[in-house]
Amino acid sequence: MNYKLATKSVLEDNSWIKPGLASWEWWHDAALYGPDVNFVSGCNYDTYKYYIDFASSFHVPYIVMDAGWAETVLNPNKPNSQMRLPELIQYGKDKNVGIILWLSWVAVEQNFDLFKTYEDWGIKGVKID
């Protein structure tokens, strides 16, 4: 239905767009539990490593990191140090799972040059609210 209602794309080359399923922790507030969770869950490296492992085991190509991945919502250039984002990006790459970052529209408006930075980091996409 969307294809029938949408106007023709103005993009001549959209081969760079890689759609796919994503695992998103916002639904349960990154609160993991169960017999295989032997760490404190939250906005930290171990939690997102767990999500990457989950996504990899079920062939989900992306995870979304929601609010909390950055030190502050309005400074999207400085990751939360507990996330160890460069390590997670590499871990995801090794497991064929890309990382999508959540952003506030205000942060994007005030830091429009960040998309090149994210590309350099290896981020696969953004989710903007």
Describe the residue ranges of each PLM region.
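Conserved structural scaffold segments of CAZyme catalytic domains across common CAZy folds
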Residues: 1-94
